[in-house]
Amino acid sequence: TQVYAFTRFKYIIDFSGFSQLDKMNLDDIEFQCNGIASGIMLAPSGLIFQIRDCFISQPKDRGITSIGTGCQGMLVDRCQFLSNEGQVRAQDRTSIAFNTNGNDVKIRENRATQFRHFAVLGGSGNLIIGNHWFQGDSETQGLRLAGIVLAQTNVRTTVVGNYIDNSSIGWTNEYEAAPDFLNQFSFGGLTVTGNHFMAIDVAPSFKWLLIKPYGAGHFVQGLNVSGNVFRCTNGSVDRVEGVDTSFAPLDNGRMRNVVFQGNGFNGVTQPSENPTLFEVNQATAAATWTALPGAVLPF
């Protein structure tokens, strides 16, 4: 049993009175929220909403909110999202730059400062390219939250060429009403390539890629993490990827097509690699050789 509270935020521009809104374009506008209002609420349905070359400054709660599928195919290009919570500890922030529920969203060349999350993406088919979001604070060994939250398992999402600063990629199936693995696709379809991952003054337990299954039986069946740079300063982190087992672990016996290769690691105690090369010494003839690669394999 859970108890839910619902809060209706106030927005500078509220399109929720439209039943459907297609091909709307906002260009070269500064939304001065001043910690009093949120930015933009989308219509409950629609296609190809575009916002480009805009500033959304100091939103109280949300920069852009999708309450339905008005974000289907949304384009967010070259915008700046400036938080009202820059002086607040990362774990105490509540504002989110934007969320989506629909598919095929393109997020390109944006900059976002010190929100709780940069993006909460409920759909699949996302292209996240060339952005810089940073979420640090002044704490020593501080906590860091997800910059991007992917809220379904088979995401068909590409994260390429971003500067991911003091935040992580969080991957959950939180939106599933029945979160246990049955006959759906499990966690897969994610490509993370050519990004700069940075962390400063974080706890050693921090991970840049964190999977959190909300039900039992899930596994990873299609993940490519390659050509990235991971760097931690003013301390080190144990490793770059992990699983939050608060609700359930992953089924490692069913993992397949998980690639970690060509990445650079600085300030990381245990780098991850798959496929990996290591030496096995077998002293006597045997039908079965046991190979123990240790902690180098992901997850």
Which ranges hold each PLM region?
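Glycine-centered flexibility motif
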Residues: T1, S95-A97, G123, G235, ...
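Right-handed parallel beta-helix
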Residues: Q2, D22-C33, L47-Q58, C71-G86, ...
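Serine/threonine-rich low-complexity intrinsically disordered regions
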Residues: A5, D14, N25, D77, ...
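Extracellular beta-strand/beta-solenoid scaffold signature
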Residues: F6-G17, C33-A43, Q58-C71, S83-G102, ...
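Extracellular receptor-binding modules and their adjoining Ser/Thr/Gly/Asp/Asn-rich linkers
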Residues: T158-G161, F181, T191-M198, W208-G215, ...
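Beta-strand-rich solenoidal segments
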Residues: G227-C232, V237-V240, F247-G253, N257
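Short, intrinsically disordered, charge-balanced linker/junction segments flanking boundaries
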Residues: T1-Q2, L297-F299
